[in-house]
Amino acid sequence: MNPLKKAYCRVFQNVFKFALPLLPYRNPKIIGSVKGITEVLEKRNYNNVLIITDAGIRSLGLTERLEQTLKRSCISYHIYDKTVANPTTVNVDEALHMYLDNDCQAIIGFGGGSSMDCAKATAARIAKPHQSLAQMKGILKIHKKLPLLIAIPTTAGTGSETTLAAVITDAETRHKYAINDFPLIPRYAVLDPKVTLSLPPFITATTGMDALTHAVEAYIGNSTTPGTRKNALDAVRLIFENLDTAYTDGNNIEARRNMLRASYFAGCAFTKSYVGYVHAIAHSLGGKYNVPHGLANAVILPMVLETYGDSITHKLRNLAVTAGLCDKHEDDKTAARMFIDAVKDMKKRFGIGDYIPEIQETDIPELAHYADKEANPLYPVPVLMDASELETLYYRLMPPAGNC
Protein backbone atom coordinates (compact mmCIF):
# COMPACT_ATOMS: atom_id res chain seq x y z
CA MET A 1 0.00 0.00 0.00
CA ASN A 2 1.34 3.42 -0.90
CA PRO A 3 2.35 5.66 2.04
CA LEU A 4 -0.37 8.26 1.45
CA LYS A 5 -3.20 5.73 1.51
CA LYS A 6 -1.63 3.99 4.48
CA ALA A 7 -1.51 7.27 6.42
CA TYR A 8 -5.13 8.01 5.54
CA CYS A 9 -6.24 4.56 6.74
CA ARG A 10 -4.45 4.89 10.06
CA VAL A 11 -5.80 8.40 10.70
CA PHE A 12 -9.33 7.21 9.89
CA GLN A 13 -8.97 4.22 12.23
CA ASN A 14 -7.53 6.32 15.06
CA VAL A 15 -10.42 8.76 14.84
CA PHE A 16 -12.85 5.88 15.30
CA LYS A 17 -10.75 4.39 18.10
CA PHE A 18 -10.76 7.60 20.12
CA ALA A 19 -14.46 8.12 19.40
CA LEU A 20 -15.36 4.68 20.80
CA PRO A 21 -16.28 5.89 24.31
CA LEU A 22 -18.63 8.48 22.80
CA LEU A 23 -20.53 6.14 20.48
CA PRO A 24 -23.87 4.58 21.52
CA TYR A 25 -22.77 0.96 21.69
CA ARG A 26 -24.98 -1.36 23.69
CA ASN A 27 -25.11 -5.08 24.29
CA PRO A 28 -28.38 -6.93 23.72
CA LYS A 29 -30.21 -8.09 26.82
CA ILE A 30 -29.81 -11.86 27.17
CA ILE A 31 -32.81 -14.17 27.42
CA GLY A 32 -31.87 -17.72 28.43
CA SER A 33 -34.75 -19.55 26.76
CA VAL A 34 -37.18 -19.20 23.88
CA LYS A 35 -39.97 -19.19 26.48
CA GLY A 36 -38.79 -15.82 27.77
CA ILE A 37 -39.76 -14.03 24.56
CA THR A 38 -43.46 -13.81 25.38
CA GLU A 39 -42.80 -11.75 28.51
CA VAL A 40 -40.90 -9.19 26.42
CA LEU A 41 -43.71 -8.99 23.85
CA GLU A 42 -46.50 -8.85 26.42
CA LYS A 43 -44.85 -5.94 28.26
CA ARG A 44 -45.14 -3.96 25.03
CA ASN A 45 -48.65 -5.20 24.26
CA TYR A 46 -47.35 -6.73 21.03
CA ASN A 47 -49.51 -9.53 19.66
CA ASN A 48 -48.31 -9.92 16.06
CA VAL A 49 -44.73 -10.72 15.02
CA LEU A 50 -42.73 -11.69 11.95
CA ILE A 51 -40.29 -14.59 12.27
CA ILE A 52 -37.49 -14.50 9.70
CA THR A 53 -35.71 -17.81 9.19
CA ASP A 54 -34.77 -20.22 6.39
CA ALA A 55 -36.29 -23.36 4.92
CA GLY A 56 -33.64 -25.64 6.42
CA ILE A 57 -34.27 -24.42 9.95
CA ARG A 58 -38.01 -24.80 9.45
CA SER A 59 -37.73 -28.30 7.98
CA LEU A 60 -35.74 -29.42 11.03
CA GLY A 61 -38.62 -28.31 13.22
CA LEU A 62 -36.46 -25.87 15.15
CA THR A 63 -39.07 -23.11 15.13
CA GLU A 64 -41.77 -25.33 16.67
CA ARG A 65 -40.93 -24.49 20.32
CA LEU A 66 -41.09 -20.80 19.49
CA GLU A 67 -44.37 -21.23 17.61
CA GLN A 68 -45.95 -23.16 20.48
CA THR A 69 -44.74 -20.57 22.99
CA LEU A 70 -46.30 -17.76 20.97
CA LYS A 71 -49.56 -19.67 20.48
CA ARG A 72 -49.92 -20.31 24.22
CA SER A 73 -49.67 -16.57 24.80
CA CYS A 74 -52.14 -15.78 22.00
CA ILE A 75 -49.47 -13.96 19.99
CA SER A 76 -49.98 -14.19 16.23
CA TYR A 77 -46.96 -14.84 14.04
CA HIS A 78 -46.04 -14.99 10.38
CA ILE A 79 -43.00 -16.83 9.08
CA TYR A 80 -40.71 -15.78 6.25
CA ASP A 81 -38.52 -18.82 5.54
CA LYS A 82 -36.98 -18.09 2.14
CA THR A 83 -33.72 -16.59 3.45
CA VAL A 84 -30.74 -17.94 1.50
CA ALA A 85 -27.20 -18.61 2.75
CA ASN A 86 -26.02 -15.14 1.76
CA PRO A 87 -29.25 -13.13 2.11
CA THR A 88 -30.14 -10.98 -0.85
CA THR A 89 -32.00 -7.76 -1.47
CA VAL A 90 -34.86 -9.89 -2.81
CA ASN A 91 -35.11 -11.73 0.53
CA VAL A 92 -35.33 -8.42 2.36
CA ASP A 93 -37.98 -7.05 0.01
CA GLU A 94 -40.12 -10.18 0.43
CA ALA A 95 -39.81 -10.12 4.23
CA LEU A 96 -40.58 -6.39 4.26
CA HIS A 97 -43.83 -6.92 2.36
CA MET A 98 -44.85 -9.77 4.67
CA TYR A 99 -44.27 -7.52 7.70
CA LEU A 100 -46.27 -4.64 6.26
CA ASP A 101 -49.07 -6.73 4.73
CA ASN A 102 -49.74 -8.43 8.08
CA ASP A 103 -49.36 -5.35 10.31
CA CYS A 104 -46.60 -6.96 12.36
CA GLN A 105 -45.16 -5.17 15.39
CA ALA A 106 -41.81 -6.89 15.94
CA ILE A 107 -39.25 -9.06 14.15
CA ILE A 108 -37.66 -12.26 15.42
CA GLY A 109 -34.54 -13.35 13.54
CA PHE A 110 -34.33 -17.13 14.02
CA GLY A 111 -31.35 -19.00 12.61
CA GLY A 112 -27.74 -18.40 11.72
CA GLY A 113 -26.14 -15.17 10.62
CA SER A 114 -28.04 -15.14 7.33
CA SER A 115 -31.47 -15.10 8.96
CA MET A 116 -30.39 -12.48 11.46
CA ASP A 117 -28.82 -10.30 8.76
CA CYS A 118 -32.04 -10.56 6.76
CA ALA A 119 -34.03 -9.61 9.88
CA LYS A 120 -31.82 -6.60 10.58
CA ALA A 121 -31.94 -5.37 6.99
CA THR A 122 -35.72 -5.82 6.91
CA ALA A 123 -36.02 -3.74 10.07
CA ALA A 124 -33.85 -1.05 8.48
CA ARG A 125 -36.12 -0.93 5.42
CA ILE A 126 -39.17 -0.64 7.67
CA ALA A 127 -37.57 2.31 9.45
CA LYS A 128 -36.47 3.94 6.19
CA PRO A 129 -39.00 2.84 3.54
CA HIS A 130 -37.85 5.37 0.95
CA GLN A 131 -34.21 4.26 0.96
CA SER A 132 -32.73 1.20 -0.69
CA LEU A 133 -30.32 -1.03 1.17
CA ALA A 134 -27.57 0.09 -1.20
CA GLN A 135 -28.09 3.64 0.04
CA MET A 136 -27.61 2.44 3.62
CA LYS A 137 -24.38 0.52 3.06
CA GLY A 138 -21.34 1.72 4.92
CA ILE A 139 -21.32 3.38 8.32
CA LEU A 140 -23.98 5.22 10.33
CA LYS A 141 -26.58 5.81 7.63
CA ILE A 142 -29.76 4.65 9.39
CA HIS A 143 -30.19 7.11 12.28
CA LYS A 144 -33.68 5.86 13.06
CA LYS A 145 -35.32 3.65 15.64
CA LEU A 146 -36.11 0.18 14.29
CA PRO A 147 -39.01 -2.12 15.16
CA LEU A 148 -38.33 -4.35 18.15
CA LEU A 149 -35.70 -6.85 16.99
CA ILE A 150 -35.09 -10.14 18.83
CA ALA A 151 -32.33 -12.52 17.71
CA ILE A 152 -32.41 -16.27 18.32
CA PRO A 153 -29.14 -17.82 17.08
CA THR A 154 -29.33 -21.47 16.10
CA THR A 155 -25.61 -21.56 15.38
CA ALA A 156 -22.81 -20.64 17.73
CA GLY A 157 -20.62 -18.59 15.49
CA THR A 158 -21.86 -15.58 13.63
CA GLY A 159 -22.31 -13.33 16.65
CA SER A 160 -24.88 -11.45 14.62
CA GLU A 161 -27.12 -11.33 17.68
CA THR A 162 -24.71 -8.77 19.18
CA THR A 163 -23.54 -6.72 16.23
CA LEU A 164 -24.41 -3.46 14.52
CA ALA A 165 -23.90 -4.99 11.06
CA ALA A 166 -26.09 -6.62 8.44
CA VAL A 167 -24.37 -8.16 5.44
CA ILE A 168 -26.49 -8.32 2.30
CA THR A 169 -25.88 -9.47 -1.28
CA ASP A 170 -27.24 -7.47 -4.20
CA ALA A 171 -29.42 -9.97 -6.07
CA GLU A 172 -28.43 -8.57 -9.47
CA THR A 173 -24.71 -7.77 -9.18
CA ARG A 174 -23.88 -10.44 -6.53
CA HIS A 175 -21.89 -7.77 -4.71
CA LYS A 176 -21.93 -8.37 -0.95
CA TYR A 177 -21.86 -5.32 1.30
CA ALA A 178 -22.31 -4.40 4.95
CA ILE A 179 -24.69 -1.95 6.58
CA ASN A 180 -23.34 -0.74 9.92
CA ASP A 181 -25.28 1.34 12.43
CA PHE A 182 -26.18 1.11 16.11
CA PRO A 183 -29.96 0.67 15.67
CA LEU A 184 -29.20 -2.70 14.01
CA ILE A 185 -28.03 -4.18 17.32
CA PRO A 186 -30.89 -6.46 18.44
CA ARG A 187 -32.63 -5.45 21.65
CA TYR A 188 -32.63 -9.03 22.91
CA ALA A 189 -30.51 -12.12 22.22
CA VAL A 190 -31.98 -15.51 23.11
CA LEU A 191 -29.12 -17.87 24.01
CA ASP A 192 -31.04 -21.14 24.23
CA PRO A 193 -28.77 -24.18 23.72
CA LYS A 194 -31.76 -26.41 22.95
CA VAL A 195 -32.23 -24.75 19.55
CA THR A 196 -28.65 -25.69 18.58
CA LEU A 197 -28.85 -29.41 19.43
CA SER A 198 -29.91 -30.42 15.91
CA LEU A 199 -27.06 -28.55 14.24
CA PRO A 200 -25.05 -30.98 12.04
CA PRO A 201 -21.39 -31.53 13.01
CA PHE A 202 -19.87 -29.79 9.99
CA ILE A 203 -21.98 -26.65 10.46
CA THR A 204 -21.17 -26.76 14.18
CA ALA A 205 -17.50 -26.73 13.20
CA THR A 206 -17.60 -23.99 10.57
CA THR A 207 -19.76 -21.67 12.64
CA GLY A 208 -17.57 -22.30 15.67
CA MET A 209 -14.52 -21.33 13.64
CA ASP A 210 -16.41 -18.26 12.48
CA ALA A 211 -16.68 -17.25 16.16
CA LEU A 212 -12.98 -17.98 16.60
CA THR A 213 -12.18 -15.73 13.64
CA HIS A 214 -14.27 -12.92 15.14
CA ALA A 215 -12.42 -13.18 18.43
CA VAL A 216 -8.96 -13.43 16.88
CA GLU A 217 -9.41 -10.58 14.39
CA ALA A 218 -10.88 -8.36 17.11
CA TYR A 219 -7.99 -9.17 19.47
CA ILE A 220 -5.10 -8.64 17.04
CA GLY A 221 -6.45 -5.40 15.57
CA ASN A 222 -5.28 -1.93 16.52
CA SER A 223 -8.54 -0.62 18.01
CA THR A 224 -9.02 -2.83 21.04
CA THR A 225 -10.20 -1.81 24.50
CA PRO A 226 -9.80 -3.66 27.81
CA GLY A 227 -13.40 -4.82 27.42
CA THR A 228 -13.04 -6.13 23.88
CA ARG A 229 -9.77 -7.85 24.72
CA LYS A 230 -11.43 -9.63 27.65
CA ASN A 231 -14.40 -10.64 25.50
CA ALA A 232 -12.10 -11.96 22.77
CA LEU A 233 -9.99 -13.96 25.22
CA ASP A 234 -13.08 -15.42 26.91
CA ALA A 235 -14.40 -16.46 23.50
CA VAL A 236 -11.13 -18.12 22.48
CA ARG A 237 -10.94 -20.02 25.78
CA LEU A 238 -14.52 -21.28 25.49
CA ILE A 239 -14.06 -22.32 21.85
CA PHE A 240 -10.91 -24.33 22.52
CA GLU A 241 -12.59 -25.95 25.53
CA ASN A 242 -15.95 -26.77 23.92
CA LEU A 243 -15.97 -26.82 20.12
CA ASP A 244 -14.58 -30.34 19.74
CA THR A 245 -17.15 -31.66 22.21
CA ALA A 246 -20.02 -29.87 20.47
CA TYR A 247 -18.74 -31.30 17.16
CA THR A 248 -18.49 -34.92 18.32
CA ASP A 249 -21.44 -34.91 20.76
CA GLY A 250 -24.07 -32.53 19.48
CA ASN A 251 -26.43 -33.33 22.37
CA ASN A 252 -23.98 -32.10 25.01
CA ILE A 253 -26.03 -29.17 26.22
CA GLU A 254 -23.22 -27.67 28.31
CA ALA A 255 -20.87 -27.55 25.31
CA ARG A 256 -23.66 -26.05 23.21
CA ARG A 257 -24.38 -23.44 25.88
CA ASN A 258 -20.70 -22.52 26.16
CA MET A 259 -20.37 -22.18 22.40
CA LEU A 260 -23.33 -19.78 22.37
CA ARG A 261 -21.57 -17.79 25.09
CA ALA A 262 -18.36 -17.83 23.05
CA SER A 263 -20.17 -16.56 19.98
CA TYR A 264 -21.81 -13.81 22.04
CA PHE A 265 -18.49 -12.71 23.58
CA ALA A 266 -16.77 -12.75 20.19
CA GLY A 267 -19.60 -10.70 18.73
CA CYS A 268 -19.29 -8.12 21.50
CA ALA A 269 -15.54 -7.96 20.84
CA PHE A 270 -15.65 -7.37 17.10
CA THR A 271 -18.64 -5.03 17.26
CA LYS A 272 -16.35 -2.47 18.88
CA SER A 273 -12.92 -3.56 17.63
CA TYR A 274 -13.89 -4.71 14.12
CA VAL A 275 -12.60 -7.62 12.09
CA GLY A 276 -9.96 -7.68 9.34
CA TYR A 277 -8.89 -9.06 6.00
CA VAL A 278 -10.11 -12.59 6.77
CA HIS A 279 -13.66 -11.29 6.81
CA ALA A 280 -13.21 -8.96 3.86
CA ILE A 281 -11.96 -11.84 1.71
CA ALA A 282 -14.64 -14.22 3.01
CA HIS A 283 -17.39 -11.71 2.21
CA SER A 284 -16.17 -11.34 -1.36
CA LEU A 285 -16.19 -15.14 -1.80
CA GLY A 286 -19.64 -15.45 -0.26
CA GLY A 287 -21.04 -12.78 -2.54
CA LYS A 288 -19.47 -14.15 -5.72
CA TYR A 289 -19.70 -17.91 -5.21
CA ASN A 290 -22.00 -18.42 -2.18
CA VAL A 291 -19.13 -19.94 -0.21
CA PRO A 292 -20.48 -20.36 3.36
CA HIS A 293 -19.04 -17.62 5.52
CA GLY A 294 -17.80 -19.78 8.40
CA LEU A 295 -16.14 -22.23 6.02
CA ALA A 296 -14.36 -19.41 4.19
CA ASN A 297 -13.16 -17.89 7.46
CA ALA A 298 -11.81 -21.23 8.67
CA VAL A 299 -9.77 -21.69 5.48
CA ILE A 300 -8.50 -18.11 5.32
CA LEU A 301 -7.68 -17.42 9.00
CA PRO A 302 -4.32 -19.24 9.37
CA MET A 303 -3.10 -17.90 6.02
CA VAL A 304 -3.77 -14.29 7.01
CA LEU A 305 -2.24 -14.77 10.46
CA GLU A 306 0.94 -16.02 8.81
CA THR A 307 0.88 -13.06 6.41
CA TYR A 308 0.80 -10.59 9.32
CA GLY A 309 4.05 -12.12 10.57
CA ASP A 310 5.97 -10.58 13.47
CA SER A 311 3.47 -7.75 13.94
CA ILE A 312 1.13 -10.04 15.89
CA THR A 313 3.41 -12.62 17.56
CA HIS A 314 2.93 -11.20 21.07
CA LYS A 315 -0.84 -11.09 20.71
CA LEU A 316 -0.93 -14.63 19.31
CA ARG A 317 1.16 -15.72 22.28
CA ASN A 318 -1.55 -14.36 24.59
CA LEU A 319 -4.17 -16.27 22.61
CA ALA A 320 -2.08 -19.44 22.80
CA VAL A 321 -1.83 -19.13 26.59
CA THR A 322 -5.58 -18.52 26.86
CA ALA A 323 -6.29 -21.54 24.66
CA GLY A 324 -4.18 -23.73 26.94
CA LEU A 325 -1.57 -24.43 24.27
CA CYS A 326 1.41 -23.21 26.32
CA ASP A 327 2.25 -21.40 29.55
CA LYS A 328 2.95 -17.70 29.91
CA HIS A 329 6.72 -18.25 29.90
CA GLU A 330 6.81 -19.44 26.26
CA ASP A 331 8.54 -17.02 23.88
CA ASP A 332 6.37 -15.03 21.49
CA LYS A 333 7.40 -16.64 18.20
CA THR A 334 7.09 -20.20 19.43
CA ALA A 335 3.73 -19.56 21.06
CA ALA A 336 2.43 -17.73 17.99
CA ARG A 337 3.40 -20.70 15.85
CA MET A 338 1.62 -23.00 18.29
CA PHE A 339 -1.56 -21.00 17.96
CA ILE A 340 -1.54 -20.93 14.16
CA ASP A 341 -0.78 -24.66 14.05
CA ALA A 342 -3.61 -25.32 16.51
CA VAL A 343 -6.04 -23.49 14.22
CA LYS A 344 -4.80 -25.57 11.27
CA ASP A 345 -5.14 -28.79 13.28
CA MET A 346 -8.62 -27.80 14.39
CA LYS A 347 -9.93 -27.26 10.89
CA LYS A 348 -8.26 -30.48 9.74
CA ARG A 349 -10.08 -32.41 12.49
CA PHE A 350 -13.32 -30.95 11.19
CA GLY A 351 -12.66 -31.93 7.58
CA ILE A 352 -12.02 -28.36 6.41
CA GLY A 353 -9.43 -28.01 3.66
CA ASP A 354 -6.81 -25.41 2.78
CA TYR A 355 -8.33 -24.05 -0.43
CA ILE A 356 -11.46 -22.47 -1.90
CA PRO A 357 -11.96 -24.42 -5.16
CA GLU A 358 -14.69 -22.06 -6.42
CA ILE A 359 -12.19 -19.24 -7.05
CA GLN A 360 -11.69 -18.44 -10.73
CA GLU A 361 -8.43 -16.72 -11.62
CA THR A 362 -10.19 -14.24 -13.90
CA ASP A 363 -12.34 -13.10 -10.94
CA ILE A 364 -9.43 -12.33 -8.62
CA PRO A 365 -8.99 -8.61 -9.48
CA GLU A 366 -12.70 -8.01 -8.88
CA LEU A 367 -12.67 -10.01 -5.63
CA ALA A 368 -9.62 -8.15 -4.35
CA HIS A 369 -11.20 -4.83 -5.27
CA TYR A 370 -14.27 -5.61 -3.16
CA ALA A 371 -12.16 -6.83 -0.22
CA ASP A 372 -10.01 -3.69 -0.40
CA LYS A 373 -13.09 -1.48 -0.54
CA GLU A 374 -14.65 -3.20 2.48
CA ALA A 375 -11.56 -3.30 4.67
CA ASN A 376 -9.79 -0.04 3.90
CA PRO A 377 -9.85 2.34 5.67
CA LEU A 378 -12.34 0.91 8.22
CA TYR A 379 -10.68 -2.24 9.57
CA PRO A 380 -7.77 -1.52 11.98
CA VAL A 381 -5.69 -4.45 10.76
CA PRO A 382 -2.15 -5.08 12.03
CA VAL A 383 -0.66 -4.83 8.52
CA LEU A 384 -2.32 -2.80 5.78
CA MET A 385 -2.67 -4.28 2.29
CA ASP A 386 -4.09 -2.80 -0.89
CA ALA A 387 -5.96 -4.61 -3.66
CA SER A 388 -2.82 -5.78 -5.47
CA GLU A 389 -1.42 -7.27 -2.26
CA LEU A 390 -4.74 -8.91 -1.47
CA GLU A 391 -4.72 -10.54 -4.90
CA THR A 392 -1.77 -12.69 -3.83
CA LEU A 393 -3.87 -14.13 -1.01
CA TYR A 394 -6.62 -15.18 -3.43
CA TYR A 395 -4.05 -16.98 -5.56
CA ARG A 396 -2.85 -18.84 -2.47
CA LEU A 397 -6.44 -19.94 -1.82
CA MET A 398 -6.72 -21.57 -5.25
CA PRO A 399 -6.08 -25.33 -5.31
CA PRO A 400 -2.82 -26.30 -7.02
CA ALA A 401 -3.19 -27.45 -10.62
CA GLY A 402 -4.45 -31.02 -10.72
CA ASN A 403 -5.66 -30.82 -7.10
CA CYS A 404 -9.15 -29.42 -7.72
Predicted regions and their residues:
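An N-terminal, well-structured beta->alpha segment
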Residues: 1-79, 400-404
